[in-house]
């Protein structure tokens, strides 16, 4: 009897073995898949890329708001060289609602478009000594998407989403989590960046063994919308300085009245970011200074992003810069959408600026100028830079907000009471480039002959600025250093236009990453999982054979059972819905919340199963009436993009 009982137990144990092996195999394979999830975002090729090695890059979506299907799109480029330390620069464009692919393909990315089919190398790209991470922020911008009834309204909400994004991005790419982290951008990103920085500082206070601190090393804001009080007033001051409006004329009087009303409204409610009365100043100025007839037969107005240029009224710069005519069709190509890991069947297509994001953005939070003193005092350096020919976020407004701001025991750029830091003349390769001014952790750089998008005009100069701000040490790199001087004094050497050699640390890192890429390829093809299953089946078969031989020797027969062990998954249905509605320009919507005209309105959504490496589970919502929005455009007459920003859809730019 004892023999029978023991044999029965032994047989039962072997029958349970397939389930145990399957569970172990699935668990092990799942852990491996999670660890290698970054392979799903790898960009294997980029249509139109120039001959030569492709810059290593990853792109795709990360879910930040499962309740409303909010996903942020990122495009990450690996650094070409590692200097004295690892660095990552996050780049954000503004709007709100303007895509950071502006920055990727027209400003600081490794490639620019020669035409809509051809990429060329960008001499001065920011990924020379830093990894660069472009993010379409907030949800609904560019390739990012969200339910159309769930656009965000607040800067704090935007910052919270961004922290979630970073946590999941670093989980996918843990090799970058200990990098020195810089956040850079322009225009309305002057509101985004300080709020994100504040959220990181608060997160770091509660960091522990699991969620350890991020090394926030600095902020860079170009032509930023930061302080309404000084920057609205600077519209007319800039117009006087540039001769757009002459003092004492009837036109000057007509513009001085709304400027005075604007300042009154700001005095009454000083903690707002946008004021309707103030937005009318720029609109009126562009309209009343328009004159002459261009080749199109339309009146000519000043380009608000570069007053050296003229444009058809009422566009006034919204079709600028000229590269934009190639960027839009390029990012809508099916092969590009596939390469960047976008679901091509369910995307409305990329648009530079989504007017719906701006129209739904109604921040009640204070302007970001109120955050800068605490950020500076926390030890995070800030660099503000301006293109001298930009009107919409002009340098006079930036210089005024610095002069009025108090931080680290002083006001403005004063070194001691009554003594201010000097403006140091900057020459770059023998040409006047601008000036630098610095005090108490804040640096200001003015770029001569430059627009709202300084990196578009001078990629090599802005890269030189970045490298100096980051403290790049090229001693281990080599290469031809640029001649960059302040007041004639040669600055520490940085290379511009590519380093000749590479550091040992970078070579070792590359070798390790190539090895990891092989394992990712195995995982992606399923070969590893297949091997595991075959081995597990062989082991189980051997144990069954051995057991049957043993029981046969004891006078018992193995009995086949009808049990089946299976592990199944229930696929979730995709969520669908229509993107409806159009944006109407009001006030400066037609100027700053641009990019309108005809928009794609077919039903769109995203298959979440393709993006679930780090996604949270979300409840089914089969009755949602208006689902994912990705790059909806506003419907201004010229089909152009928004700018600086505004809760009323009136501002910002890229």
Curated annotation (Swiss-Prot):
Protease with a carboxypeptidase B-like function involved in the C-terminal processing of the lysine and arginine residues from protein precursors. Promotes cell fusion and is involved in the programmed cell death. This is Pheromone-processing carboxypeptidase KEX1. It catalyses: Preferential release of a C-terminal arginine or lysine residue. Residues 567-583, 645-654 have a biased composition (Polar residues). It comes from Sordaria macrospora (strain ATCC MYA-333 / DSM 997 / K(L3346) / K-hell). Gene3D superfamilies: alpha/beta hydrolase. One of its GO terms (cellular component) is trans-Golgi network. Residues 1-29 form the signal peptide. The keyword Cell inner membrane does not apply. It is found in: Golgi apparatus, trans-Golgi network membrane. The gene is KEX1. Residues 612-626 have a biased composition (Basic and acidic residues). Residues 563-654 are annotated as: Disordered. Pfam families: Peptidase_S10 (PF00450).
């Amino acid at each position: 009897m004892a023999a029978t009982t023991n044999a029965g137990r032994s047989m039962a144990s072997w029958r349970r073995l397939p389930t145990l092996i399957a569970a172990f195999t699935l668990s092990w394979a799942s852990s491996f898949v999670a660890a290698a999830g970054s392979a799903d975002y790898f960009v294997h090729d980029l249509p139109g890329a120039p001959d030569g090695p492709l810059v290593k890059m990853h792109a795709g979506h990360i879910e930040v708001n499962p309740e409303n299907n909010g996903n942020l799109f990122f495009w990450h480029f690996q650094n070409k060289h590692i200097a004295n330390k690892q660095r990552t620069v996050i780049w954000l464009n503004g709007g709100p609602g303007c895509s950071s692919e502006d920055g990727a393909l027209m400003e600081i990315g490794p490639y620019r478009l020669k035409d809509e089919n051809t990429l060329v190398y960008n001499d001065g790209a920011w990924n020379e000594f830093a990894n660069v991470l472009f993010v379409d922020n907030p949800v609904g911008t560019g390739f990012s998407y969200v339910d159309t009834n769930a656009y965000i309204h607040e800067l704090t909400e935007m910052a919270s989403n961004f922290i979630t994004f970073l946590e999941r991005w670093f989980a996918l790419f843990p090799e970058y989590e200990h990098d020195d982290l810089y956040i850079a951008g322009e225009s309305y990103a002057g509101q985004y960046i300080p709020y994100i920085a504040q959220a990181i500082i608060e997160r770091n206070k509660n960091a522990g063994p699991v969620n350890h601190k991020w090394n926030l090393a600095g902020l860079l804001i170009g032509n930023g919308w930061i302080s309404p009080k000084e920057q609205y007033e600077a519209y007319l001051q800039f117009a006087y300085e540039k001769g757009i409006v002459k003092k004492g004329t009837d036109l000057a009087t007509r513009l001085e009245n709304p400027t005075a009303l604007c300042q009154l409204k700001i005095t009454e409610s000083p903690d707002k970011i946008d004021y309707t009365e103030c937005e009318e100043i720029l609109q009126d100025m562009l309209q009343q200074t328009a004159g002459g007839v261009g080749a199109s037969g339309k009146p000519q107005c000043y380009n608000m992003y570069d007053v050296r240029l003229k444009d058809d009224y009422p566009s006034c710069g919204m079709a600028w810069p000229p590269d934009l005519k190639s960027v839009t069709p390029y990012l809508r190509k099916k092969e590009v959408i596939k390469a960047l890991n976008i679901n091509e069947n369910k995307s409305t297509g990329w648009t530079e600026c989504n007017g719906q994001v701006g129209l739904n953005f109604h921040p009640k939070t204070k302007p970001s100028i109120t955050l800068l003193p605490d950020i500076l005092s926390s030890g995070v350096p800030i660099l503000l830079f301006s293109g001298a020919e930009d009107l919409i976020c002009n340098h006079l407004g930036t210089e005024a907000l610095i002069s009025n701001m108090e931080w680290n025991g002083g006001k403005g750029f004063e070194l001691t009471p009554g003594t201010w830091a000097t403006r140091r003349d900057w020459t770059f390769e023998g040409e006047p480039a601008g000036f630098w001014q610095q005090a108490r952790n804040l640096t200001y750089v003015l770029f001569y002959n430059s627009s709202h998008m300084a990196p578009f005009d001078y990629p090599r100069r802005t890269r030189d600025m970045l490298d100096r701000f980051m403290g790049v040490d090229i001693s281990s790199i080599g290469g031809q250093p640029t001649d960059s001087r302040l007041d004639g004094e040669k600055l520490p050497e940085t290379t511009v236009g590519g380093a000749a050699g590479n550091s040992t640390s970078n070579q070792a890192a590359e070798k390790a990453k190539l090895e990891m890429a092989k394992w990712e390829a195995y995982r992606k093809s399923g070969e590893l999982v297949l091997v595991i299953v075959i081995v597990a089946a062989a082991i189980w078969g051997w144990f069954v054979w051995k057991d049957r031989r043993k029981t046969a020797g004891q006078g018992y027969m193995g009995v086949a059972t009808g049990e089946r062990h299976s592990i199944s998954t229930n696929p979730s249905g995709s969520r669908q819905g229509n993107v409806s509605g159009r944006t109407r320009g009001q006030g400066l919507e037609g100027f700053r919340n641009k990019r309108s005209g005809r928009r794609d309105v077919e039903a769109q959504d995203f298959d979440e199963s393709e993006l679930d490496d780090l996604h949270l589970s979300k409840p089914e919502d089969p009755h949602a009436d208006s689902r994912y929005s990705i790059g909806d455009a506003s419907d201004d007459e010229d089909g152009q993009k928004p700018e600086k920003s505004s809760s009323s859809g009136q501002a910002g730019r890229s």
